[in-house]
Design a protein with these regions (language model features):
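Short, intrinsically disordered linker segments that flank or connect zinc-binding domains
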Residues: 1-3
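Active-site neighborhoods and metal-handling regions in enzymes and metal-associated proteins
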Residues: 6-8, 15-291
Length: 291
């Protein structure tokens, strides 16, 4: 049962301010927009200043780990070595790898090579070869706060076709980011991502998308990219989520490896690419917290 907040009561956000001096006008605007049929966020999706500060500290570890991998990933390296780097660096800095034991996932990182769309298992048997593209997806818990981002890496002499896929996927993220602003919609961002991929002859995975993040590994809302401008949930200050489209060189169809129920592949065996950033909606735009 919801309890009505009085104008002079402490605001629900935890700022310590009176409701009338903090989020009352905000809530009234949200209620008006909801009355017009739009999907609006609940209060629990809006982070306060203390939570944002804690999340930013977690992001520092995540960025440092990916920066290190970017400098040291190389041909001949196996992906189990990447997993060890992620575990060792994260724990040395006081964090916990968020994927480790998450819903039974047995590793500290996801390493997805070529036609692997996401959730690739690190392995001593997966040795990086010249011509490979790989997504390294790192997620960190620090003092109960979560961060999540991924980058693509080209190993050795990569074909122009694969390089273009990697570059266009990054452009999709950048174009989607430009659409993130308060009182816009997730559909604005999703359509920008989808349209750029489609214009370049690619497809965007439908079944897997971005998500809210910060207090949990995966929070609402689910963030899709086959959406229309002006649709989906409203973007408001304090929301934190990932933009992480998975863009396929060929057909959109994917499948999950039945041997482990984790690793996702393209149905046609053609490469897939993904970049992931973590974004905060601010009062006047957005801030990228993790990349």
């Amino acid at each position: 049962m919801s309890v009505k907040i009085g104008r002079n009561d402490p605001c629900w956000c935890g700022s310590g301010k009176k409701y009338k001096a903090c989020h009352q006008a905000f809530d009234e605007r949200i209620a008006m927009i909801a009355s017009q049929g739009h999907i609006v966020p609940t209060h629990d999706l809006i982070k306060n200043a203390d939570q944002i500060a804690g999340i930013k500290e977690s992001c520092k570890i995540n960025i440092a780990v990916l920066d290190y991998i970017e400098k040291h990933i190389h041909e001949g390296m196996n992906t189990a070595e990447i997993d060890k780097i992620v575990y060792d660096m994260t724990t040395e800095m006081g964090g916990i790898p968020a994927p480790l034991n998450y819903e039974g996932y047995p590793y500290s990182v996801c390493t997805s090579v070529n036609d692997q769309v996401c959730h690739g298992f690190p392995s001593k048997d997966v040795i990086l070869k010249s011509g490979d593209i790989i997504n390294v997806d790192v997620s960190t818990i620090l003092n109960g706060y979560f961060s999540d981002s991924s980058r693509m890496f080209c190993i050795g002499d990569v074909s122009p076709e694969k390089k273009r896929l990697v570059e266009v996927t990054k452009e999709c993220v950048e174009l989607g980011l430009k659409e993130v602003k308060p009182w816009g919609c997730f559909g604005d961002m999703g359509q920008a991502v989808h349209d750029h991929a489609f214009a370049n002859g690619y497809t965007v995975v439908r079944e897997i998308g971005g998500h809210g993040v910060g207090l949990e590994f995966h929070e609402e809302p689910w963030v899709g990219y086959n959406t229309k401008r002006g649709q989906e949930m409203l973007l408001v200050p304090g929301m934190i989520f990932t933009i992480e489209p998975m863009v396929n060189m060929g057909k959109v169809d994917i499948y999950v490896d039945s041997k482990n129920d984790w690793e996702v592949y393209t149905e046609d065996g053609l490469p897939s690419a993904q970049w992931e950033i973590m974004v905060l909606v601010t009062e006047d735009g957005h801030e990228v917290l993790c990349w």
